[in-house]
């Protein structure tokens, strides 16, 4: 399957790489954003100090393709790592299924972008499969867990499972330092940290990709994301939140780059 990025898509990725590189250099997401855009960086209190930016692309502009390429850019320019753990959040279970099919298909452009960035060492799984995630897989591959935001919440049946103690995940918690132990949340009814998927994510500090981010900018969503101790959050949406009034529970996205409808039309 032949795939070539559009000019506007390449520009998005170039701007994102530049921002991530500058954030790493400064160790300051706020200042890097202001240098890049000359606009105020809107902090989310639960995620203060975190690179949390948005690429605004009209519907039909290839947001999933951009997200797939962005994983490699973040690993190279911000995380400075040859592999990473990714939590890829889609707005509906239908889109989760579509995304899973694309990312697991080695001939699909999205998967090929990932394989190129990580030399073919990529594992893609849904949330249920991630409940059995083994240390060896995390140490050899870039692991991408695809889910909805709703499924991560404690009130959801699947969400509860990711916070539960699990012997299957035990090897991921061997040999932790005191500092690492201090990051973990205790299991219900236990005096020790839970050997849970949620705590595994906290240890590994995932890169979080948010598809259609306007559905995920609520206090409850921020609270859910903060529990995973992310290293970076990248949003891709056609309709970002633009009003910033936290007292009224409006939290504006930090739009790093905006593709106009005219740019899209010119190439399609």
Give residue spans per PLM region.
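RecA-like P-loop NTPase motor core of helicase/translocase proteins
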Residues: 1-268
């Amino acid at each position: 399957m032949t795939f070539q990025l559009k000019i506007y898509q390449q520009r998005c990725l170039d701007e994102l790489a530049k921002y991530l590189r500058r954030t790493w250099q400064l160790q300051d997401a706020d200042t890097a954003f202001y240098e890049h855009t000359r606009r105020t960086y809107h902090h989310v209190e639960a995620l203060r100090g975190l690179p949390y930016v948005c690429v605004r692309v009209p519907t039909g502009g290839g947001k999933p393709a951009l997200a797939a390429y962005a994983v490699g850019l973040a690993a190279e320019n911000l995380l400075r790592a040859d592999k990473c753990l990714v939590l890829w959040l889609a707005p509906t279970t239908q889109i989760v299924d579509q995304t899973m099919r694309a990312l697991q298909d080695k001939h699909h452009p999205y998967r090929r972008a990932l394989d190129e960035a990580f030399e073919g060492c990529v594992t893609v799984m849904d949330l249920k499969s991630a409940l059995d995630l083994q240390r060896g897989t995390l140490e050899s591959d870039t692991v991408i867990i695809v889910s909805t935001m709703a499924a991560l919440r404690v009130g959801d049946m699947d969400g509860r499972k990711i916070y539960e103690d699990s012997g299957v995940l035990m090897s991921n918690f061997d040999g932790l330092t005191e500092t690492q132990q201090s990051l973990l949340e205790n299991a219900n009814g236990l005096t020790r940290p839970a050997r849970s998927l949620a705590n595994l994510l906290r240890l590994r500090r995932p890169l979080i990709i948010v598809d259609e981010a306007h559905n995920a900018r609520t206090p409850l969503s921020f609270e859910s994301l903060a529990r995973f101790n992310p290293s970076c959050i990248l949003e891709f949406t056609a309709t970002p939140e633009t009003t910033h009034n936290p007292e009224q529970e409006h939290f504006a996205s930090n739009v790093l780059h905006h593709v106009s409808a005219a740019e899209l039309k010119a190439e399609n």
